[in-house]
Design a protein with these regions (language model features):
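Contiguous beta-strand/loop segments that form the cofactor/metal-binding neighborhood of enzyme cores
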Residues: 1-64, 95-108
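Short acidic, glycine-rich loop/turn motifs
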Residues: 25-29, 73-80
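C-terminal helix-rich "cap/oligomerization" subdomain common to oxidoreductases
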Residues: 28, 98-139
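Structured beta->alpha junctions
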Residues: 39-41, 88, 115
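Active-site loop of classical SDR/Rossmann-like NAD(P)-dependent oxidoreductases
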Residues: 84-97
Length: 139
């Protein structure tokens, strides 16, 4: 990710960070992606990645630690649409267990150090962009 523009809003919840976040990410490879999360009215999370041959979107209707349906939509330039309903998986517990196994040297952690640093940089840029209301470049 090279650039991030994000906004947040406080509608119902009293969270310091607000209850709605929307971020546009511009990637080095030329792709762009959109992340949206609404923590109330009801909960909604969406990640969409736009490429030159089509787009893919994942929609979650519940928080990662709460059972609920997800839908994956793939739309290609040829007009074909593929929709897949996904069953809930407890990714929060799976990540914690994977981390414990990595600390105990039983398994490799699912994210490389480079991916972890990039994730932190993106989250930091989302925070800065939402506060400054401008595009943030990631170095």
């Amino acid at each position: 990710v090279e650039k991030v523009f994000a906004t947040t809003s406080k509608r119902i919840l009293k969270f310091k960070t607000g209850d709605v976040v929307s971020a546009t990410l511009l990637h080095k490879e030329g792709l762009s992606s959109q992340i949206t999360a609404i923590l109330k009215t009801p909960h909604y999370q969406r990640v969409t990645i736009f490429g030159d041959k089509g787009w893919v979107e994942l929609i979650d209707s519940s928080h990662p630690d709460t059972p609920g349906p997800s839908e994956l939509i793939l739309r290609m330039n040829n007009g074909k649409i593929k929709k897949t309903n996904l069953n809930w998986t407890d990714t929060v517990s799976a990540n914690i267990n994977n981390f414990i196994n990595a600390v105990q040297r039983k398994k490799e952690y699912i994210f490389t150090d480079e991916e972890k640093f990039q994730n932190v940089a993106v989250l930091d840029a989302i925070n800065k962009s939402s506060l400054k209301r401008k595009v943030i470049n990631i170095k």
